[in-house]
From Swiss-Prot:
Residues 1-16 form a transit peptide. GO terms for biological process: cellular response to hypoxia; cholesterol biosynthetic process; fatty acid beta-oxidation; negative regulation of mitochondrial membrane permeability involved in apoptotic process; negative regulation of mitochondrial outer membrane permeabilization involved in apoptotic signaling pathway. The gene is ACAA2. The modification Phosphoserine is found at S121, S140, S310, S333. PROSITE patterns: THIOLASE_1, THIOLASE_2, THIOLASE_3. It comes from Homo sapiens (Human). It catalyses: an acyl-CoA + acetyl-CoA = a 3-oxoacyl-CoA + CoA; 2 acetyl-CoA = acetoacetyl-CoA + CoA; acetyl-CoA + H2O = acetate + CoA + H(+); propanoyl-CoA + H2O = propanoate + CoA + H(+). GO terms for molecular function: acetyl-CoA C-acetyltransferase activity; acetyl-CoA C-acyltransferase activity; acetyl-CoA hydrolase activity; fatty acyl-CoA hydrolase activity; RNA binding. This is 3-ketoacyl-CoA thiolase, mitochondrial. Pathway: Lipid metabolism; fatty acid beta-oxidation. Coiled coil: none annotated. The keyword Acetylation applies. The modification N6-succinyllysine is found at K25, K45, K137, K143, K171, K191, K209, K211, K212, K214, K234, K240, K305, K312.
């Protein structure tokens, strides 16, 4: 076994994902985490007093209270003030990383029950002004910086994230047509799963205000199930002439959060929790920043090797859909079985709120694996700057 102790998922919930500037735009990342965490505590019948640690992933730190995020989430959901909290940032892998950190705390017996999660409000990413605190003269031309837009460029290699995906398209000979067809598949799979109610077990509905008054939001807002291939083919490439990445085949800018509660085997017995899945293992790897999207390849390979398993053992595989060519490069490199990979659509359809996606993917795999009667699943994400992260779970159903 890859972990030193048995670690189990006892609850896994996520909010619906809101479109950029959509129904969730007025909720901070802290608010969104609170919704997910409350739902997870309730679903797992976990008393806040039993939680030993709170670990939340968040990337953009977009709200004024963001530096307190994990701490505020813990206090808001009733976890005792004596219980410590930690906010972490491994970019797009932050939701997964919260679970990794939680496993580590449990394995070294620093904690028995950990509230993990990831969250992002990309709609609330502020405009900011740099280098004006000192020496700014009267009448200076103040330049506003879009913190969301600039964050999507890796300054170390001077490449926007989309261009790292274009690099993979060239390297793996991936065509624009293949990218659009994959994007359409993501939308169609999301629609089929949503219509069938496959997201119900993971979803934590939110009450939102609209022009028509208050309503309950329980469906991902970003998805465009009516999309056609013809519409996708008409969209212009965003970053490169004759490129492959368009607004239609890239992950959606979104708002949302997820929460995953993990517990040691001892805690499961002591508190009579119902284990939904076991955390089998995890792996984090670095890769070339100019093709950061290939990160899931070494991450999945490393996690499988540590666990003594193979891709053939996996009943479900999730690779976060940052960009269609990025996903397709991973699919080709690992020779993934498309019948069990991203089976209910992914971030191209429902959006990618940076810190929230790892928690969303984990929650989905936990419930989908049980629904299908499968045994093993692996979830993964590429990470800006050139990294990959993967977590393997085993159903306990």
């Amino acid at each position: 076994m890859a972990l030193l102790r048995g670690v189990f998922v006892v609850a896994a919930k996520r909010t619906p994902f809101g479109a950029y500037g959509g129904l969730l735009k007025d909720f901070t990342a802290t608010d969104l985490s609170e919704f997910a965490a409350k739902a997870a505590l309730s679903a797992g019948k976990v008393s806040p007093e039993t939680v030993d640690s709170v670990i939340m992933g968040n990337v953009l730190q977009s709200s004024s209270d963001a530096i307190y995020l994990a701490r505020h989430v813990g206090l808001r959901v009733g976890i005792p003030k004596e219980t410590p909290a930690l906010t972490i940032n491994r970019l797009c892998g932050s939701g997964f990383q919260s679970i990794v950190n939680g496993c580590q705390e449990i394995c070294v017996k620093e904690a028995e029950v950990v509230l993990c999660g990831g969250t992002e409000s990309m709609s609330q990413a502020p405009y900011c002004v740099r280098n004006v605190r000192f020496g700014t003269k009267l009448g200076s031309d103040i330049k506003l910086e879009d913190s969301l837009w600039v964050s999507l460029t890796d300054q170390h290699v001077q490449l926007p994230m989309a261009m790292t995906a274009e690099n993979l398209a060239v390297k793996h000979k991936i065509s624009r047509e293949e990218c659009d067809k994959y994007a359409l598949q993501s939308q169609q799979r999301w629609k089929a799963a949503n219509d069938a109610g496959y997201f119900n077990d993971e979803m934590a509905p939110i009450e939102v205000k609209t022009k028509k008054g208050k309503q309950t939001m329980q469906v991902d807002e970003h998805a465009r199930p009516q999309t056609t291939l013809e519409q996708l083919q008409k969209l212009p490439p965003v970053f490169k002439k004759d490129g492959t990445v368009t607004a239609g085949n890239a992950s959606g800018v979104a708002d949302g959060a997820g929460a995953v509660i993990i517990a040691s085997e001892d805690a499961v017995k002591k508190h009579n929790f119902t284990p939904l899945a076991r955390i089998v293992g995890y792996f984090v790897s670095g890769c070339d920043p100019s093709i950061m999207g290939i990160g899931p390849v070494p991450a999945i390979s490393g996690a499988l090797k540590k666990a003594g398993l193979s891709l053939k053992d996996m009943d479900l595989v999730e690779v976060n859909e940052a960009f269609a060519p990025q996903y397709l490069a991973v699919e080709r490199s690992l020779d993934l079985d498309i019948s069990k990979t991203n089976v209910n659509g992914g971030a191209i359809a429902l959006g990618h709120p940076l810190g929230g996606s790892g928690s969303r993917i984990t929650a989905h795999l936990v419930h989908e694996l049980r629904r299908r009667g499968g045994k093993y699943a692996v979830g993964s994400a590429c990470i800006g700057g050139g990294q990959g992260i993967a977590v393997i779970i085993q159903s306990t159903a």
